[in-house]
Amino acid sequence: MRKTLQKVMSFYLFLFLLPILLIKIPILAFGVDVPKQVDTQPVAYAANVTKEIPVVEESSPINVLLLFTHSHEAYHPIVKQVIGVNANYDPSTNITDTSDLITHHFQLNNAQVDLLQYDNMKEMKVTNRPFYQAYAAIRPVLQKQLNTKPYDLVLDIHRDSAKHKITTLESNNESFARIAFVVGAGHSNYKLNEAYAKALSAEVNKIVPNISRGVMTKTKDDGNGIYNQDLSSKSILIELGGIQNTQEEINRTLAVIAKAVSVVFENNTAT
């Protein structure tokens, strides 16, 4: 009797535990796979969390050598504010004062400017050299500097003697000092300089239409004919406005020149 009761109790216990066993044990029940429990909590893996960030490589700055062969050339509106009268040349207030502005605008356009620290017209006066010898006077100083490092551009800045009507441009309610590019054809490699001058002239005109008066290629019959441009294949002379241009007009134009230099020399668009 006792054994029969034990068998009955065991049978009922088995029936009670059977559903639990079917859940806990991964077996085939009624021909259907019992899926394993899947953890839906997110798991962070270092390899997956770190996103690939593209590296932006900055191009090397354009190396520019800046000089002023006619270092005492002046602008009437600017010099008059200082000395009270108009003057075409002044030993203190002159075109060399634009060097800080040029450096500033060029730095904003990934260009590093070295200024040739030489007051050419002052030294010419000391040695009693005539005006027409200005390029010969500065040549050894320029040559020495060019030997120190390679330059992508040698920029000789001048002020034209032309009047306001010729050297000024009105564009979008702002006035700009117009510029002219001068290339000396009195040496065998002038075509290289001319190509860069033409590229720069075209680029500034894209930024501000008609701001460039064009490229003037001159032989010795037209003037100096070389302008020390035989010392570098990327040497350019720029006439920055004229005697009647203002500080504001010059500043706006320098911003345009700096941008054009950046485009032409970084993309090497001179042809």
Regions found by a protein language model. Give the residues of each.
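N-terminal Sec-pathway targeting helices
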Residues: 1-16
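N-terminal, intrinsically disordered, polar/charged segments of Gram-positive cell-envelope systems
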Residues: 20-65, 73, 86, 271
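Active-site histidine-acidic residue metal-binding/catalytic motifs
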Residues: 58-129
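Soluble non-cytosolic domains of exported or imported proteins
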Residues: 89-97, 132-136, 187-195, 244-252
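Active-site microenvironments of hydrolase-like enzyme catalytic domains
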Residues: 141-184
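Active-site-adjacent substrate-binding region
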Residues: 191-217
